[in-house]
């Protein structure tokens, strides 16, 4: 065990001896960030991919399956902005981010206790716990995004996050394969209980690694002041809300990106519960098949990351976002005409390559669109806005089945995804036009 720890420490340090300079500290932090991502996805992938099948084994209804997506989104609406304000007030953000992460991972132990509930309450207990789990989960996600944006400078992000995502997908898929096989091998519900407890233990290792990131290597950033009360009294709530809305309106680039993202996320997430229902109820997928689908998806993503990094470095974040999102209509289109899990698995290679670009560009475009001042709060505003889409989308998806069959529902979802992708093309054109006007005005001023 000590040999493994020494080997990991050697990898993190990059083989360098003595006191590291600024460049070496950055490289070390980037390596730790990648390793943290591996253990993070290992813990999460022992739980998240199998929740829908777990719910159906607990006799959950279609509406309850949809609530596995909508419930966490509803909870996060009330968590992200207060959490972001709290994080923004911290000079050092790592400790608070870790506490949010630990609180989120502790819910894995609560999930393991669901079989002890009365059978009629188990499905609702799962829905409630998954929703409540997102209270610290959404806070930790917002805090991590703000924290890591300070650790990794803009010119290093494309490569750094591509490497992180590549290793996360690779090791995450290995974990899903092993977990799926174990779940199908062990009797229900023992397998799920074992997996949820193992996920929590893995999360403890994850947090230990995250704590190794050197926050002092990041540029100094003073905490956001709490604000001085006017005449000894705090400003009324509506006045504070109005002030924040005015601040957001003064960031047109951010507002455009938020509106486009809301429409995109709505179109992206509508078919999510339909995929799970179709896989299990129509194509009769088990946990092993969920693992196989993840494996094929990862195979495509490992190829895709290198391609999309090159596109991003050449064309920028927004164009890359459009170039990648325009193809995600293929996923519901394949489901509309697929009657075999093997067909879905084969096309998952292609969709994995596509979504590696989507995930990479979404995150980098967000960091680019948010102002440096109060960055955590702006990230929370963004996440809150797209969460509204996440609340509505699964219900719309399940609702489509009340009016049409799976095939037509998937075709409608494919059309909506094309419309969602076009939103990013629109804001890219608007920004190019504004940049052109700014350049022309500058030329006129110089010639005057």
Give a label for each model feature.
Residues 2-78, 87, 94, 98-104, ...:
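Helix-loop boundary and gating motifs at the non-cytosolic
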Residues 49-57, 85, 112-118, 172-196, ...:
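Transmembrane alpha-helix termini and helix-breaking/packing motifs in multi-pass membrane transporters
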Residues 62-63, 154-164, 287-288, 370-382:
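Loop-to-transmembrane helix entry/capping segments in MFS-fold secondary transporters
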Residues 78-95, 183-184, 303-317, 401:
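Helix-to-loop junctions at the C-terminal end of transmembrane segments
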Residues 95-111, 197, 319-334, 411-414:
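Structural signature of the two symmetry-related core transmembrane helices
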Residues 192, 207-226, 425-438:
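Helix-loop junctions on the cytosolic side of multi-pass membrane transporters
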């Amino acid at each position: 065990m000590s040999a493994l720890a020494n080997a990991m420490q050697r990898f993190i340090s990059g083989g360098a001896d003595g006191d590291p300079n600024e460049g070496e500290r950055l490289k070390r932090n980037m390596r730790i960030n990648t390793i943290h991502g591996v253990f993070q996805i290992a813990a999460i992938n022992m739980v998240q991919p199998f929740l829908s099948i777990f719910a159906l084994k607990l006799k959950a209804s279609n509406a309850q399956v949809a609530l596995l997506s909508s419930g966490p989104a509803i909870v996060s609406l009330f968590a992200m902005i207060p959490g972001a304000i709290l994080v923004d007030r911290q000079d050092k953000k790592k400790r608070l981010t870790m506490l949010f992460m630990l609180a989120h991972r502790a819910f894995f132990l609560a999930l393991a206790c669901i079989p002890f509930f009365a059978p009629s309450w188990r499905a609702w207990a799962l829905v409630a716990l998954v929703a409540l789990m997102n209270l610290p989960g959404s806070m930790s996600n917002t805090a991590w995004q703000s924290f890591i944006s300070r650790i990794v400078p803009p010119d290093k992000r494309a490569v750094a996050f591509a490497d992180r995502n590549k290793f996360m997908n690779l090791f995450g898929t290995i974990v899903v394969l092993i977990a799926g096989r174990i779940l199908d091998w062990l009797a229900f519900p023992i397998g799920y209980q074992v997996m949820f407890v193992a996920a929590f233990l893995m999360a403890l290792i994850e947090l230990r690694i995250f704590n190794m990131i050197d926050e002092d290597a990041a540029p100094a950033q003073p905490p956001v002041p709490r604000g001085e009360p006017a005449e000894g009294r705090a400003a009324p709530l509506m006045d504070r809300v109005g002030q924040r809305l005015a601040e957001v309106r003064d960031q047109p680039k951010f507002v455009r990106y938020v509106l486009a993202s809301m429409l995109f996320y709505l179109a992206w997430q509508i078919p999510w519960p339909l995929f799970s229902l179709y896989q299990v109820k129509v194509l009769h997928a088990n946990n092993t098949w969920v693992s196989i689908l993840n494996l094929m998806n990862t195979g495509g993503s490992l190829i895709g990351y290198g391609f999309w990094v090159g596109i991003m470095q050449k064309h920028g974040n927004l164009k890359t976002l459009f170039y990648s999102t325009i193809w995600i209509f293929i996923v519901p289109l394949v489901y509309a005409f697929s009657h075999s899990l093997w067909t879905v698995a084969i096309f998952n290679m292609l969709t994995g390559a596509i979504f590696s670009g989507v995930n990479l560009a979404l995150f980098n475009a967000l960091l680019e669109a948010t102002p440096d001042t109060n960055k955590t709060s702006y990230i929370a505003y963004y996440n809150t806005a797209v969460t509204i889409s996440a609340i509505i989308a699964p219900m719309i998806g399940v609702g489509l089945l009340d009016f049409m069959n799976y095939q037509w529902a998937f075709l409608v979802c494919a059309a909506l995804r094309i419309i969602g992708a076009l939103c990013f093309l629109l804001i890219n054109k608007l920004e190019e036009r504004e940049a052109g006007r700014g350049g022309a005005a500058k030329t006129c001023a110089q010639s005057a």
